[in-house]
Amino acid sequence: MTGEQLYIAGNYGDLNGNTALDHIAKWDGTTYSEVGGTIGGAVPLIVLDLLASDFNGSNLLYAGGRFLTIGGVSALNVAVWDGTAWDDLDGGLSRTSGFAQVLHMTSWDDGSGPALYVGGRFNLAAGNPISTNIAKWDGTSWSSMGSGFDADVHELVAFDDGSGEALYALGSFSMVGSRP
């Protein structure tokens, strides 16, 4: 992907009557076009967040939401578009029980290099246990961020309050790990 591009996503089955634009599309200023195919899985399907990032040196579009496939690729709730094809992120994010979903993503550097931070409702990454409802993707693999949160993480924001940039989480949780 090069230059500025506008992508839209959401809870829709078609756009202007075109079902190929299911849940995600690209706008060129005149018309909408397909972004590598549609999403699939158990209903309801939705793409809840898009993030364009070059944190690993490549211009990539990350999609997060509630889906099992995107563009014919198995991708549990999170995927990356390189301008040509979708790819899963090492098996994606899921839950041991109930439905999983990615609600928000942001790019941030915690001092070990820029990475993708993901919040939502999940406790497995690539089928392995991970911090509840928050995870870090370094471009190769998932890692935990402490023990996580007791409920959904709706938003992640990097902010410098004057003492250095930090990552803040907002959501419907009341506990961070074992702390209220």
Give the positions of each predicted feature:
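Extracytoplasmic surface signature
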Residues: 1-180
